Amino acid sequence: MKTDLKHGDFKQLDKNLWVLDGELPHHLPLPRSMTVFRMNDGGLWIHSAIALDEKRQRQLESFGRPNYLVVPSKMHRLDAPAYKQTYPSIKVVCPEASRAKVEEKVAVDNSCENEFQGSEIKVHTMPGAKPIELAYELPLASGGKAMVFNDLLVNVTEVKGLMGRLLKFIGRVGAFRSPPSNKLILINDRALFHQWLDTQARRNDVKIITVAHGDPVTEKISQRFTEAAIQI
C-alpha cells in the first residue's frame, strides 16, 4: 500500500477496537481518523480507511484479516481504491444513498444497511439526518458499545495555522459537535436530529465514540451527546 500522506500510529481503545489519525491532502489542517474493529469471526471492519505505510500495514494485518471496507460517504473515498488493490477480497460497503458517488472511485459490493442486517454491527439511519451517511454501533469486549460517526459529528479541538483558524471560524473545529455547515449539507430536520442525539444521551451503554475527524470520546459520553444536541 502506497501513501504520500503522513499518519500516526494505531491507538487501541478496547480489545478489538483501534483508531489511527492521518492528514488530508494539500496540507489541510483538519485531521482524519480511521476506525478498525475486529469482528467475532476475527475479520476486520475498517471505517474511513487511511492508506498506510508498510509498518502500519503489517500492524493492521496482525489485528486480523481485512474483511470489510466501509466507505462512509462520497467525501471519504480517497484511499478506498488502495485498500481494494491491496486486499482484493475485501468487501466494499457504503450507505445505499451514497453508492452511486462511491462507485465513481471503487466498486461497491453491498450497502451497509443490507450487509450488516442481523449482524453484530448495528447500523443507525439517524432521524433528521440525510441517509448519505450512517452511524454504526459496535459491541465492546469490555462491555457496552462503541458508536462510530463520519462527518455528522466531529471532535477536533486544536488546529494550527491560518487555515486552522479559518476552519475554527466557520465551525469545523470544536469539541464534540455537529459543525454548522451540516445544517445545510447533512441535516434535513434539526428537531428530529436533536431528539435522536438526546435519546443517545439517555443511554448508559455507550462507552466510546469515534469520529472521522478528531479524537475519540471516552469519558462523559452522555454529557457529550447532550452538548452536541444543544448545538443543533
Residue map of PLM features:
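Pre-active-site segment of Zn-dependent metallo-hydrolases
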Residues: 26-67
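Short gly/pro/ser/thr-enriched loop/turn and capping motifs at secondary-structure boundaries
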Residues: 77-78, 99-102, 155
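Zn-dependent metallo-beta-lactamase
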Residues: 1-41
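Short, hydrophobic/aromatic-rich segments at coil-to-beta transitions
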Residues: 15-20, 45, 118-122
